[in-house]
Amino acid sequence: MDYNLIRITDSTVLSDAGICYYDPIEEVIKEIGSGYMMGTNPTSPVIHKLMLVIKNGSIKKVNIKIVKNKELESLFDIKILPGVTAPGISSFADIDAFNDLEISDGLQPYSLIPFHVYIKTKGPINALLNAPLELTYEF
């Protein structure tokens, strides 16, 4: 996927910023909704590439937080890292599970900032229903 060819419009995200994924079937960026599932593998960690989409040029800082609860913590280790290129599994070794990602650089209007979500299951689970990500931003 060539990021230079992706066009961000007013309809890409509903708010001033949003978390999106690339839909390879329609070949477009889509905002994550309530029915978005993240595939997992019971035998090895999986890394998903998502994108922070900025629509409003007045945003100064964005925080992406993994929302945790006891049930989620008992089933998964989830970590996030920024970056255009896909990190290897070992890149997540020194990152605490359920970490936050704060971004204050590169927040331009109609831009996207890639980040990666690492999911390791603690049992025979094939999907994580409803991505547990919370997005907050400051003007």
Where are these regions (language model features)?
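Beta-sheet-dominated interaction scaffolds and their linkers
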Residues: T12-K55, V67
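Intrinsically disordered, low-complexity, compositionally biased regions/tails
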Residues: Y22, M37-G39, T43, P87, ...
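Extracytoplasmic low-complexity repetitive segments enriched in small/polar residues
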Residues: G33-M38, I59, D105, T121-P132
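Short, intrinsically disordered N-terminal pre-domain segments
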Residues: M1-I19, E138
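C-terminal interaction-tip segments
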Residues: D10-T12, P124-F139
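Short, solvent-exposed loop/turn segments enriched in Ser/Thr/Gly
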Residues: N41-L50, S111-F115, N126-E134
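Beta-strand elements of well-folded, non-transmembrane domains
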Residues: I54-N56, K68-K70, I119-G123, Y137-F139
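Surface-exposed binding patches on compact interaction domains or structured appendages
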Residues: N4-I6, G57-L112
